[in-house]
């Protein structure tokens, strides 16, 4: 692994970010900014939910599962927003609001990476169901963001995509 082989350098960081097919980011500022400035696609496995990077049409993302400590159930999309954790970025904030973050499964991550690879190579076949789910997801996302009554909107035009397979397998989550 590049980061642990002892050959890491600032030049190689920039070179790899500029030349990669895509970058896998686990959230927060950091390396993914390098591929971003070179217009390379990013796969985001992201929290906080309200701060999904939506401005690059080549980006794909999923979010960690939000589990209620009280009911032990996975929260729906709108429940994440109504639980005051959509913009939280520290584990302490989630704990204070009674929410546990559950990492995405290896299958969920693999599905997202495969989708990105298929999109880049022109092999991805978007279905009518996928288009409908993307529209429903982003519409619900924008509605919930408006309810936060922020002084200034966090997102302009939404260009990114949420993981299609994740949406297909979690349709009840989008409400």
How does the language model describe each region?
Residues 57-175:
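Leloir-type glycosyltransferase catalytic cores
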Residues 1-68:
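Donor-binding and catalytic core of enzymes assembling or modifying cell-surface/extracellular glycoconjugates
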């Amino acid at each position: 692994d590049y980061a642990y082989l002892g050959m890491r350098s600032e030049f190689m960081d920039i070179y790899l970010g500029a030349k990669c097919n895509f970058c896998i980011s686990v959230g927060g500022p950091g390396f993914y900014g390098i591929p971003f400035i070179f217009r390379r696609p990013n796969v985001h496995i992201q929290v906080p939910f309200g701060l999904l990077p939506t401005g690059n049409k080549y980006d794909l993302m999923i979010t960690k599962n939000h589990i209620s400590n009280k009911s032990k159930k996975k929260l729906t999309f709108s429940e994440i927003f109504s639980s005051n954790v959509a913009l939280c970025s520290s584990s302490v904030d989630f704990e204070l609001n009674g929410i546990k973050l559950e990492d995405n499964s290896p299958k969920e991550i693999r599905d997202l990476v495969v989708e990105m690879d298929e999109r880049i190579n022109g092999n991805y076949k978007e279905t009518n169901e996928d288009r409908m789910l993307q529209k429903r997801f982003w519409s619900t996302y924008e509605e919930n963001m408006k309810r936060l009554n922020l002084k200034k909107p966090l997102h302009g035009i939404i260009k990114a995509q949420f993981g299609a397979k994740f949406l297909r397998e979690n349709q009840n989550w989008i409400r």
